[in-house]
Design a protein with these regions (language model features):
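N-terminal basic/disordered segments at the start of proteins
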Residues: 2-40, 50
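Short beta-strand elements
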Residues: 32-36, 44-46, 149-151, 193
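Short beta-strand scaffold segments in enzyme catalytic cores
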Residues: 42-44, 136-140, 147, 236-238, ...
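A glycine-rich, hydrophobic loop/mini-helix early in the fold
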Residues: 57-125
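Conserved, well-ordered active-site substructure
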Residues: 246-256
Length: 256
């Protein structure tokens, strides 16, 4: 684990009101834009503006998910894994599989799964592509990136995760009991999970966040993350107050 300052080529944050997006300046040769379809609100950094095409793709992606939920309301409501039928779309199946691996409901994987689906679809058109969906990110990149870890919106980020070109594509998904509107049964300020799968990173962030209630639980979180390594989890960062724990492929750098 390194704490040597690194050049910040781009950063993504977790924040309550998404005001952090105003501070995300794209690198030279890149643009940033927003894509909103119903409840899905994406912040994207790419080599060119792909917002129109992404909006159309997002409509098509959400349609089968909404139809499946209408026919199977337990998929939306359950806090535990559910079985899916043969009529399920790839997105619905990916979310269900990730939820089963982590012991949570399938909607715990939705933001990360959507971020990856969008990023993978448009990476051929923009090899440098960062898709952030409410603190859940999927990244393709030809250059180093630093992802800021924002546990306290008032204080700003002091640590970031350095990712090198060999690390991409990858997902970084977050869970917090103190930031944002997503359900967490824990009390942690920030759980950030790295994985190749967006659905898995998102589901794992929820599952690990549910474990973090006191500082004594930090070691429990890292042990649980390590147990999920065979499923595809590469690393975790956990913070509660002034205490942090890190496991796996998480190269931290100081920001500021």
């Amino acid at each position: 684990m390194s704490r040597k300052p690194a050049k910040k080529t781009a950063a993504l944050h977790l924040g309550a009101e998404r005001g952090y997006r105003r501070s995300l300046d794209p690198a030279a040769g890149e643009v940033s834009f927003q894509v909103v379809v119903e409840q899905t609100d994406l912040h994207v950094v790419a080599r060119r503006d792909l917002s129109s095409a992404m909006g159309s793709f997002l409509h098509g992606l959400r349609g089968p998910l909404k139809a499946y939920i209408a026919a199977h309301p337990e998929y939306l409501e359950s806090l535990a894994p559910v079985e899916v039928g043969p009529d399920a779309s790839p997105l619905v199946r990916d979310m269900a599989e990730a939820a089963r691996a982590c012991g949570v409901g399938p909607m715990a994987a939705v933001a990360g799964a959507i971020a990856q689906a969008v990023a993978d679809r448009f990476a051929p058109e923009s090899p440098d592509l960062l898709v952030e969906n409410g603190g859940d990110c999927y990244l393709h990149s030809t250059k180093p990136r630093t992802v800021a870890l924002l546990a306290d919106p008032a204080g700003g980020p002091s640590l970031g995760l350095l990712l090198n070109p060999r690390d991409f594509p990858c997902s970084l998904c977050s869970s917090s009991a103190s930031i944002g509107h997503s359900l967490s049964l824990g009390a942690g300020d920030l759980i950030a999970v790295r994985a190749a799968s967006g659905a898995l990173a998102d589901a794992a962030a929820t599952a690990l966040g549910n474990l973090l209630r006191t500082r004594r639980d930090l070691s429990r979180v890292t042990a649980a993350a390590q147990a999920l390594q065979p499923a595809g989890i590469d690393g975790v960062f956990a913070q509660l107050g002034g205490s942090i724990a890190v496991w796996g492929e998480m190269e931290l750098v100081a920001l500021g």
